[in-house]
């Protein structure tokens, strides 16, 4: 495992996804790499998304919540990007969840290859399609 002196800002855009958000945030909070700044943007949700965001922020000091009027995915991401302090930026959609070692593996790959960007594949759950 690499030294945890590099901060990764993880940006989560959330709009009316109360049924998925807990699993998403749990998957980020439980990463094997811990030096994360987690920026969750409640993009004008009308369900319990905002409350769930605040609940998680109260439990984990790495989480900051931004509440804003609905600006769409790009607007939500850009709002968080303005305040992000990490040396690397990661994006997780609020209705997705990630493997426990995703950010550790991606950062390792960046450092080993002197890369400024890492991308990964995804698996579509509940469907026969996988990318």
Predicted regions and their residues:
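Nucleotide-sugar donor-binding/catalytic module of glycosyltransferases
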Residues: 1-131
């Amino acid at each position: 495992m690499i030294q945890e002196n590099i901060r990764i800002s993880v940006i989560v855009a959330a709009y009316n996804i109360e049924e998925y958000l807990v699993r998403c945030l749990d998957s980020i909070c439980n990463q094997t790499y811990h030096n994360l700044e987690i920026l969750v943007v409640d993009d004008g949700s009308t369900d319990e998304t905002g409350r769930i965001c605040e609940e998680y922020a109260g439990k984990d000091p790495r989480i900051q919540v931004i509440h804003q009027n609905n600006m769409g995915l790009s607007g939500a991401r850009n709002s968080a990007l303005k305040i992000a302090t990490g040396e690397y930026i990661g994006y997780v959609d609020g209705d997705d969840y990630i493997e426990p070692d995703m950010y550790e593996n991606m950062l390792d790959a960046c450092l080993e290859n002197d890369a400024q960007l890492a991308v990964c594949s995804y698996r579509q759950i509940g469907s026969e399609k996988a990318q």
